[in-house]
Amino acid sequence: MTPNTSPGSTLPRAQVLAERAFSTLEKFLHIEAFSGVVLLLAAAAALIWANSPYADGYHHFWHTAVSFSIGSWSVSESLHFLINDGLMTIFFLVVGMEIRREIHEGALANMRLAALPLAAALGGVVVPALIYFILNPGGEAAHGWAVPTATDIAFAVGVLALLGRSIPSNVRVFLLALAIIDDIVAVLIIAVFYSGGMDYSGFIIAAVGILMVLGMQRIGIASAYPYVIPGAVLWFGLLKTGAHPTLAGVVLGLMTPVFAPHARTHPLELASKALKDLWNQTANSTPDPHHLAHPLKQLRRAQRDLLPPVSRVQMALHPYVAFGIMPLFALANAGVSLDGIDMSATGSMSVMLGVLIALVAGKPLGIIGASFLMVRMGWCALPPGVTWGGVCLVGLLAGIGFTMSIFIATLAFNDPNLLGAAKLGILLASLSAAVLGLAWGFFQAKRKQPAVA
């Protein structure tokens, strides 16, 4: 050991290196574009896996049963179900909270602004359905008219994230609001046209969950953890109705308070006292960990009380959603097998082209057209910072139908050839919409950059 090296000096150096490593990791985790890259890599891995010699392993893995039991009660669901209907509820919770914040003080703060995503979403449903029906007017092929009406919100947001900070935040909010409305319309279409109806008793259970949330908010429960219980009740109620249970996340997100809870002691005063206690404790060369615990706890409480719940929970969940849940969702759902698709079968080509054209051209036409009409008539206004170029970007990205479109296709077609053709059309359309959206987004960002002399 050299004279300048001692255990005491080695520890601070190791601590500095660790802090730098965690700081670098934290920067990566908060780069929007990096989360988009991770999502696309997961999707590419799934697509390659599903079309490799190990394709059977891919499908068997995601359909592995996961069981949970207490005494005589037990439940068993596939891994695929737990991701799509369980973990994705957290994704929709974050989306719902982002929209809640914007309704309070942002891009959706008044009716003229909030009505635009609704009109755009309806245009993005009607026009693709009409285009598909024109190309497939009869027979079983006509049953797939709803396939191109859907938008895969997770992939659309993931591709938008690749554009990073170059795109105004209100464009993202517009896309989120539109995609959620699109999702709700898709659920209604499935319930009315592709199922035996809804079990309305589930709405009573869902209502109980909502009332539990309102009651807990009323008595001032600030911690997020207790709300898991009424959230689970709401989720189960929606599952029982036949609707997509992940919508429970949207409902909870929209119910999240936008104001910090009223505390007896002002959070800044509490934080100041806690920091003073910490300073006094760490003045000793060897502070007692037991004495540090209380001021650290008070500091965390001050942080909790200072931030509105909608911001606090969203910030806490964002890294887990962006780098955990969304890549898992992509890995579990992007594995579309192209093996055995017979495009020479009757109706296959028209189904594939109908889906492809309706998603790539119909979605943007419907969204841009409805938005232009509403703004031109004076019924709506573009959100602050959103130009017509931004509306075009949202229209293009909304053409990423992917998982929701595939789900509707499996309900619409009994013929395996038509189903295979629809899946191929969805895959080609989603890839095309993503590429066109990225190209248009980079073009828009470049136009904003000042010319270098």
Swiss-Prot record:
It is a multi-pass membrane protein. Its main location: membrane. It is found in: Cell inner membrane. It comes from the Bacteria. One of its GO terms (molecular function) is sodium:proton antiporter activity. Keywords: Antiport, Cell inner membrane, Cell membrane, Ion transport, Membrane, Sodium, Sodium transport, Transmembrane, Transmembrane helix, Transport. The chain crosses the membrane at residues 28-48, 79-99, 115-135, 144-164, 173-193, 196-216, 241-261, 321-341, 355-375, 393-413, 424-444. It holds the Pfam family Na_H_antiport_1. It catalyses: Na(+)(in) + 2 H(+)(out) = Na(+)(out) + 2 H(+)(in). GO terms for cellular component: plasma membrane. One of its GO terms (biological process) is regulation of pH. HAMAP family: NhaA. Belongs to the NhaA Na(+)/H(+) (TC 2.A.33) antiporter family. Na(+)/H(+) antiporter that extrudes sodium in exchange for external protons. NCBIfam families: NhaA. PANTHER family: NA(+)_H(+) ANTIPORTER NHAA, SODIUM ION/PROTON ANTIPORTER NHAA-RELATED. This is Na(+)/H(+) antiporter NhaA. It comes from Janthinobacterium sp. (strain Marseille) (Minibacterium massiliensis).
